[in-house]
A protein has these predicted regions:
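S-adenosyl-L-methionine
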Residues: 1-17
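Conserved Class I SAM-dependent methyltransferase catalytic core
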Residues: 3, 123-179
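Residue-level signal for inorganic ion chemistry
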Residues: 10, 99, 128, 186
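Conserved SAM/SAH cofactor-binding pocket of Class I
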Residues: 12-109
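Glycine-rich, phosphate-binding/catalytic loops in enzymes
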Residues: 91, 112-115, 160-161
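Mobile active-site "lid"/loop adjacent to the S-adenosyl-L-methionine
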Residues: 100-127, 131
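SAM/dcSAM-binding transferase cores
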Residues: 177-222
């Protein structure tokens, strides 16, 4: 699987102000989010779970090739299985981050691996948020990127689990296009939401200064 813009956006935008010591990446794919968290933070434990076997193997390989392999741990498990184990052990995470499957209103393709990565039939927002609520420390943060059209639906489910939006960034490709993505940060604390908007391009392959400044530490060339 190629590294997508969504993952890099989330990994760069996610706040580390609470100085997390334990981080969980749900649905790691290639491991990009966990690797970005290792680069940006001094967290001693960064766990990553992935249900797809091929993607999991790629995650582990990327961890081993990185400079932070001693802090990165991959688990081949479903979100539900992993959550049950963490709850049983009485553990929590200071930060949970996820670029979850979406396109819930689109028919799956013939590529089963791609389907697992992109369709909510494999990890619904309900299941994701229920798991986050069980594994997140009481003063922890949960960062996620979702389609903008799903934002209201997602945040309504989150409220059921006492998770409230604290930061929000709505993303669009350029000034002429509609908002496509919502970057959200949630916690168990109710507070005034810090909202912003990000435009990625001024023109085709001509990136805005705001986007460049956000992701510059993660691209060799942009």
């Amino acid at each position: 699987m190629k590294i997508g813009t969504d993952g890099v956006l989330l990994g760069a935008w996610c706040s580390l102000e609470n100085i997390p010591d334990t981080i969980l990446d749900i649905g790691s794919g290639t491991g990009i989010l966990a690797l970005m968290m290792a680069q940006r933070s001094s967290a001693s434990i960064i766990d990553a779970i992935e249900i797809d076997e091929d993607a999991f193997e790629q995650t582990v390989q990327n961890f081993e090739l990185s400079d932070w392999g001693d802090r990165l741990y991959g688990y081949h498990a479903s979100c539900k299985e992993f959550t049950a184990e963490i709850v049983e052990e009485g553990e929590t995470y200071d930060l949970i981050i996820s670029n979850p499957p979406f396109y819930s209103d689109t028919y799956p393709s013939n590529d089963s691996a791609r389907n697992k990565a992109r369709f909510t039939v494999h990890l619904s927002f309900e299941e994701l948020l229920a798991s986050v609520a069980k594994m997140l420390a009481k003063d922890g943060n949960f960062a996620v990127i979702i389609p903008f059209k799903e934002e209201a639906y997602f945040t309504n489910i989150a409220k059921k689990y006492h998770l409230h939006v604290t930061r929000r960034c709505r993303v669009k490709g350029n000034d002429k296009t509609e908002i496509k993505r919502s970057l959200l940060e949630l916690s168990f604390r109710e507070t005034i939401v810090k909202s912003e908007e990000l435009t990625l391009e001024k023109d085709r392959h001509q990136y805005t200064d705001a986007y460049r400044n956000l992701v510059k530490d993660f691209y060799l060339k942009l």
